[in-house]
């Protein structure tokens, strides 16, 4: 659990997302309130519920990215889902309780990885012993084993192929799903693969190089040192206390008052979400999960529907409203220059792997931002995602010929951008299809 202050959280989000100050402040306060709640006494702690958030804004302005970065900062179980993927209970499709089951699955995987790291040193020693035994043979003398161990540590045996007996993690039930219930495994709540594991599981013999075998052996030896019940208990606590669920496209299940049609399950999805967001208990294969203190962040563009078209009860369960504004040309310039994961840095690094040096000049960056903003304005506003399309088009020729141009320096200025994009950006009909 992160103990960052709201100011520190916003500062960290600023490294990856430009603008949207109100949304950043809202999620920062929501995260800090979790830390505050943990400082309270037992009598009051259960009474403090998270203030769920509704983000309203066009596509590509940072709604999803804010939530994803927040989850990483909080080191919390996180799940992003689309509201349109779910149907009302009784109809063919996934019901909303699957959200919590998927969140629990993600939490167990994260918790297991974290606990593996804690026992990695001991697991590494056991893995090394198994590799030495495979190299020297089971009945080898201690002196021979030590000789192989020394060579192993010096990396002299990395390419040598050995045969090992490993746990078979593939589940014969993995691909069996209930017809019409995507993502719902055959066997319902029964974890058949876990049942097989309890009886020792299946082991297979595999031939691997010494270097390849280490990661598999360390993971297997670490799992032997872990208590499965402790992993599940820690994961379920993380879900219940720190879980974050991001529900995208919530506006697509908001039925407009004047709308007519056969989409009967839209309002039903909203009704099914009510108890989940309010607080209920969901059965998972790891045990029951209470959703009372899971933070729900819903988002939507609300181009056609309005937030007031949501069920009044659902509106009441999303008390914090945040509007995200559309991005401007100046925002695009900042996105290309100020963020830690800026596209300019990414393309420079990608071309450097081919020995090509790429230099972005300020007027080139401004030209990219201008064209992205113009196309957004004239065709369809898809926010920062337009930059991906524009830059990919500019670099199309260079990306193809880069292996033949090793040692060259390419300067991306306004003329370079104009040469590769000028005609397309000026022709609305063409940009509608190409950009």
From Swiss-Prot:
Q: Which residues cross the membrane?
A: none
Sorted alphabetically, the Gene Ontology cellular component annotations on this record are: HslUV protease complex
Q: Where in the cell is it found?
A: Cytoplasm
Q: What CDD domains is this protein classified in?
A: RecA-like_HslU
Which Pfam family is one of this chain's hits? AAA_2
Q: Keyword annotations for this protein?
A: ATP-binding, Chaperone, Cytoplasm, Nucleotide-binding, Stress response
The residues the record assigns to binding ATP are 18, 60-65, 248, 313, 385
For the biological process aspect of GO, one term held by this record is:
protein unfolding
Q: Where is the signal peptide?
A: none
Q: Any idea which GO molecular function terms this record carries? A: ATP binding; ATP hydrolysis activity; peptidase activity; proteasome-activating activity
SUPFAM superfamilies in the record = P-loop containing nucleoside triphosphate hydrolases
Instruction: Show the InterPro entries listed in the entry.
Output: AAA+_ATPase (IPR003593), ATP-dep_Clp_protease_ClpX (IPR050052), ATPase_AAA_core (IPR003959), Clp_ATPase_C (IPR019489), HslU (IPR004491), P-loop_NTPase (IPR027417)
The lineage's top-level taxon is Bacteria
Q: What does this protein do?
A: ATPase subunit of a proteasome-like degradation complex; this subunit has chaperone activity. The binding of ATP and its subsequent hydrolysis by HslU are essential for unfolding of protein substrates subsequently hydrolyzed by HslV. HslU recognizes the N-terminal part of its protein substrates and unfolds these before they are guided to HslV for hydrolysis.
Family membership noted in the UniProt record: Belongs to the ClpX chaperone family. HslU subfamily.
Please give the subunit comment from the record. Answer: A double ring-shaped homohexamer of HslV is capped on each side by a ring-shaped HslU homohexamer. The assembly of the HslU/HslV complex is dependent on binding of ATP.
Under what name is this protein listed? Answer: ATP-dependent protease ATPase subunit HslU
Q: What is the originating organism of this protein?
A: Paracoccus denitrificans (strain Pd 1222)
